[in-house]
A protein has these predicted regions:
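Glycine-rich beta-alpha junction loops
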Residues: 40, 163-165, 182, 187-191, ...
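Glycine-rich phosphate/pyrophosphate-binding loop regions near the starts of catalytic domains
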Residues: 22-188
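N-terminal amphipathic/basic leader segments beginning at the initiator methionine
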Residues: 1-33
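Short, acidic (Asp/Glu-rich) active-site segment that either coordinates a divalent metal cofactor
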Residues: 65, 156, 169-223, 262
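Residue-level signature of catalytic and energy-coupling elements of molecular machines
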Residues: 9, 66, 179, 255, ...
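Glycine-/charge-enriched secondary-structure boundary and capping motifs
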Residues: 2-6, 119-134, 150-155, 209, ...
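Hydrophobic face of alpha-helices
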Residues: 17, 121-124, 195
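Short, acidic Gly/Pro/Ser/Thr-rich loop/turn segments
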Residues: 13, 49-50, 68-71, 166-169, ...
């Protein structure tokens, strides 16, 4: 009996390694050291010594990990695997920049039922695309074939991001104060949270198939809308951070993921402060309205589960809010004043 008889194909793994090599190497810069396929990836922190010393006197490394959750089940239903890798990168790097740091490199883990090199290459293409968007290197990864654990065409994935921030420029929300402005950056739909509820409502209770096109979605299918990739905010947010280096301009940063605005915005504010959110300051995207109507799901539950169209929030000094928003718009972001910081909390206030 062989390992292949037991369901693990080492040759398929070797073919996958060859297929994904160009996808991995397109994310590399001269800061990546060592040959492709080594036991561990190496990344040079001080590649440009002069530039490094100019920006980092006390560099602090940042690490985070996250996954995509049951959004993968929508990908299985549509048999489309080239975007969930973008989600995987986004969920990590959008978290990482919340302390003011920049992503350096990314690692991934895939657990699969049957290793199909072509299908795995689609997943890695998405991860590679996400790394390019986030300007970080795909430094390495692991793919484990476990036929006793997963169904043949199913898999799970996890990502790990490492970044760096100058110690004196760490953003932790401690200098936020009443009167500061909360700037919202628009999401591109559901992103990667709330899929347990979204699938239950749309695919089970409402009975939609992934190919169905409800009129509420303006021509998009249910599957297309649910599989829309998570927006990566790295380049835009870092551009603002580099332009406004004075610490008391950008006070706090929040990635709006599971728990929505109520579960994420208070996390970055000190005790005694909250944000008064203007509910009418943005138009809630159609996908959220459809979920709410078909559930039905009440407003409070929607706000506590989904991003509701707000993917990221910056808390900034009031005198700088308008120029920061102008800069973000030139970078391609849709943004608006979400509300203002005031005394109170820990819950958000709604206007």
């Amino acid at each position: 009996m062989t390992y292949k008889d037991a369901g693990v194909d080492i040759d398929a793994g070797d073919r996958m390694v060859d297929l994904i090599r160009p996808l991995v190497e397109r994310t590399h810069t001269p800061r990546v050291m060592g040959a492709y396929g080594g036991f561990a990836g190496m990344f040079r922190l001080d590649f440009n010594e002069r530039l490094f010393k100019q920006n980092y006197r006390e560099p602090v490394l940042i690490g985070c990990t996250d996954g995509v959750g049951t959004k993968l089940m929508v990908a299985f239903a549509m048999d489309r695997l080239d975007t969930v890798g973008i989600d995987l990168v986004a969920m990590n790097v959008n978290d990482l920049i919340c302390c003011g740091g920049e992503p350096l490199f990314f690692l991934d883990y895939l657990g699969v039922g049957k290793l199909d090199p072509a299908r795995m290459a689609q997943i890695v293409k998405g991860i590679s695309d996400g790394c390019v968007q986030a300007n970080c290197a795909l430094l390495g990864g692991e793919t484990a074939e476990m036929p006793a654990f997963y169904k043949p065409r199913e898999f799970d994935m996890a990502g790990f991001a490492v970044g760096v921030v100058e110690r004196r420029r760490i953003i932790d929300g401690r200098c936020a104060e009443p009167g500061d402005v909360a700037i919202a950056l628009a999401s591109d739909g559901l992103h990667s949270n709330g899929y347990g509820l979204a699938r239950r409502v749309l695919l089970e209770k409402a009975g939609y198939g992934v190919a169905d096109r409800p009129p509420e979605l303006d021509g998009a299918s249910v599957g297309e809308e649910m599989l829309r990739p998570t927006r990566i905010y790295v380049r835009s947010v870092l551009n603002v951070l580099r332009h406004y280096r004075v610490k008391r301009v950008i006070k706090a940063l929040a990635h709006i993921t599971g728990g929505g605005l109520p579960g994420n915005l208070p996390r970055v504010l000190p005790d005694g402060l909250t944000v008064r959110v203007k509910r009418d300051s943005w138009q809630v995207p159609a996908i959220f309205k459809l979920i709410a109507a078909k559930g039905p799901v009440d407003d409070l539950e929607m706000l506590n589960v989904f991003n509701m169209g707000v993917g990221f929030v910056l808390i900034v000094a009031p005198d700088f809010a308008r120029p920061i928003m102008n800069r973000l718009r030139t970078l391609g972001e849709r943004c608006w004043v979400l509300g203002k910081v005031r005394k109170g909390g820990p819950e958000l206030e709604w206007a």
